[in-house]
């Protein structure tokens, strides 16, 4: 890696993080707000709020100019309260009779204190809600909105139970900041976590320089300067990122197990503390969509109040983490994909709850999802849809399911006597990430559905495909791969993708998953494998809603890497954060009468 002298460290690193933060995603737009307030609104900038421990947080407040008391919508953000993507909806909401407060969270932009993700959001969120309720133009009803980490600030505030919090509307956010934000089934979410950390380092680095240039002395190297791939191929993973800029990142790497460090912030551990209605908004190609679905199901099942349990709503759109729209990746999903824009959805939510307006939310079913293939929104009674039928597609082959040239198949018939499929996983030559749920650098790696045939040409990717369908088949619900596996290594990964194969061969990825074998027993501790021993595992591919059209085929991809979305398993049993060497692994999928590996889907009844 290139070495950077301390004299030029801050200038090069700062220019770098500014550039990527501006380019990577609409959530990190660097331009200041350009939308001017109308004569119907009043804007107050940098309004202070003191937290219980004496730290001052600053907010911009947008409110109607007419005297009176109004419901409040609060956003608490680490991404800068003055950027246009936050401000533009505020003006629209003011015109609908809401006060909108956008607050920089602790340690970010104008607010004082130390930035450390998740650590202060319960207490600070509680304090912010109660402060907002006491403002002279507030009617005491406080709602919240926002995406990604701004969704996390809502969830964490909700489990703190501030008395005046009346509802929240999290968009594309996680349910657990260990599994689903930093790790997934034991594998490190490398592309997201290193991109997100580097983007937020823009402001952290600027604050450090402003406060004390000497804070950076002694850190002569920064992997930020080697972007776009953060030296992803170099081990160990945690050896370069400076603790002065992102100490939490090193803490994340130091806690691969699901331990008390993570449990203190886990939403899943605290669904029983959620006492308010929630509207969860997600996207089929969002990196947090599994968490969005779990947030809905968890609060509905375990919420603290009858209101919380009965007023959970779920909207899954077509899109990724950075936004929704008609086209994502290689696929145009048609005109219906642009329906349900987020700001309008949020306004309808709060009009219904806070103002008693009888809009669609008063009569619609609580779940609405965009169904790919049919390319339209559909409403459901619940998630997962109760009428969907669990259906197994069993894996078959003549012992050579490797690549598009192989003989793997999927059928409804259980296997009998069949040879297994084996491939070599080499950490030095991992299967590349191509599309799927990605954030936050579309310039270098585009998210969403991409034609997977370039990946499927590899011999270290197994393919199991149905015959072309004779009629449409709708799959809506969770997706799981139950596999019987063995390996020559003491630890390895298994990955899977559900793919919709069109008649012309276009292979659209729908959803995907991974399992690090050392965490197959529990996320709380590691259990290495015995080489050659057969294990039954379950890969969670989250969920989808897709109509496999007549003439299309279902396909299950299996491999042992998906890099750089996930870090590479070195196969040695060593923690990847400290690994300096790797070995190849011979990995095997069994499918016979004693080992009936299968893809498990929820199939909707024919109309």
Q: Can you say where each PLM-predicted feature lies in the sequence?
A:
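N-terminal cap/lid segment of alpha/beta-hydrolase-fold proteins
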Residues: 33-68, 465-471, 484, 525, ...
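Cap/lid segment of the alpha/beta-hydrolase catalytic domain
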Residues: 64-134, 180-184, 188-190, 325-333, ...
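Accessory cap/linker subdomain of secreted extracellular hydrolases
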Residues: 95, 159-273
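Alpha/beta-hydrolase fold nucleophile elbow
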Residues: 136-149
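Short glycine-enriched nucleophile-adjacent loop
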Residues: 151-162, 483
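C-terminal, loop-rich substrate-recognition/catalytic regions characterized by aromatic stacking residues
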Residues: 216-236, 330-607
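Short beta-strand/loop motif that positions the catalytic acidic residue
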Residues: 274, 280-282
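Active-site-adjacent alpha-helix of alpha/beta-hydrolase-fold enzymes
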Residues: 290-312
């Amino acid at each position: 890696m290139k070495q950077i002298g301390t004299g030029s460290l801050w200038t090069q690193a700062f220019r770098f993080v500014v550039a990527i933060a501006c380019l990577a995603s609409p959530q990190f737009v660097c331009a200041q707000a350009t939308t001017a307030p109308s004569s119907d609104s009043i804007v107050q900038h940098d309004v202070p709020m003191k937290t219980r421990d004496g730290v001052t947080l600053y907010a911009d407040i947008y409110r109607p100019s007419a005297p009176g008391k109004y419901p409040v919508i609060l956003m608490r953000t680490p991404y800068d309260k003055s950027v246009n993507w936050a401000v533009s909806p505020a003006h629209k909401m003011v015109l609908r009779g809401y006060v909108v407060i956008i607050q920089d969270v602790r340690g970010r932009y104008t607010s004082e204190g130390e930035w450390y993700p998740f650590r202060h959001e319960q207490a600070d969120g509680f304090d912010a809600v109660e402060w907002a309720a006491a403002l002279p133009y507030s009617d005491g009803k406080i709602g919240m909105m926002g995406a990604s980490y701004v969704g996390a600030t809502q969830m964490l505030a909700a489990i703190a139970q501030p008395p005046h919090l009346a509802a929240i509307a999290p968009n594309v956010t996680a349910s657990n900041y260990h599994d689903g934000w930093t790790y997934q089934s034991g594998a490190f979410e490398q592309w997201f976590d290193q991109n997100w950390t580097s983007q937020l380092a823009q402001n952290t680095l600027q604050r450090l320089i402003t406060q004390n240039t000497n804070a950076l002395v002694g850190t002569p190297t920064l992997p930020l300067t080697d972007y776009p791939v953060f030296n992803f191929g170099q081990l160990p993973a945690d050896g370069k990122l400076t603790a002065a800029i992102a100490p939490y990142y090193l803490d994340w790497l130091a806690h691969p197990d699901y331990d008390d460090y993570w449990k203190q912030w886990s939403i899943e551990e605290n669904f029983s503390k959620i006492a308010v209605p929630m509207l969860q908004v997600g996207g089929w190609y969002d990196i947090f969509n599994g968490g969005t679905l779990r947030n809905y199901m968890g609060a509905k099942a375990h919420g603290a109040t009858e209101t919380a349990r009965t007023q959970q709503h779920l909207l899954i759109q077509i899109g990724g983490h950075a936004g929704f729209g008609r086209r994502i990746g290689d696929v145009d999903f048609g005109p219906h994909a642009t329906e349900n824009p987020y700001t309008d959805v949020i306004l309808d939510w709060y009009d219904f709850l806070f103002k008693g307006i009888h809009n669609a939310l008063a009569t619609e079913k609580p779940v609405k999802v965009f169904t790919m293939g049919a390319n339209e929104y559909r409403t459901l009674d619940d998630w997962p849809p109760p009428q969907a039928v669990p259906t197994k597609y069993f894996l078959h082959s003549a012992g050579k399911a490797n690549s598009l040239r192989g003989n793997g198949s999927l059928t409804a018939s259980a296997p009998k006597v069949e040879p297994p499929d084996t491939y070599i996983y080499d950490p030095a030559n991992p299967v590349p990430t191509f599309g799927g749920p990605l954030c936050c650098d579309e310039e270098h790696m585009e998210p969403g559905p991409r034609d997977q045939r370039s990946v499927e040409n590899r011999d270290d990717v197994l393919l199991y495909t149905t015959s072309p369908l004779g009629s449409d088949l709708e799959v809506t619900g969770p997706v799981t791969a139950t596999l019987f596996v063995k390996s020559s290594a003491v630890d390895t990964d298994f990955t899977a993708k559900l793919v919709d194969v069109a008649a012309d061969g276009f292979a659209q990825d729908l959803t995907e998953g991974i399992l690090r074998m050392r965490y197959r027993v529990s996320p709380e501790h590691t259990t290495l494998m015995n080489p050659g021993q057969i294990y039954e595992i379950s890969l969670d591919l989250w969920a989808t809603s897709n109509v496999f059209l007549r003439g299309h085929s279902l396909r299950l991809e299996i491999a042992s890497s998906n890099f750089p979305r996930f870090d590479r398993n070195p196969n040695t049993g060593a923690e990847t954060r400290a690994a300096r060497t790797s070995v190849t692994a011979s990995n095997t999928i069994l499918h016979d009468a004693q080992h009936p590996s299968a893809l498990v889907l929820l199939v909707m009844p024919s109309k």
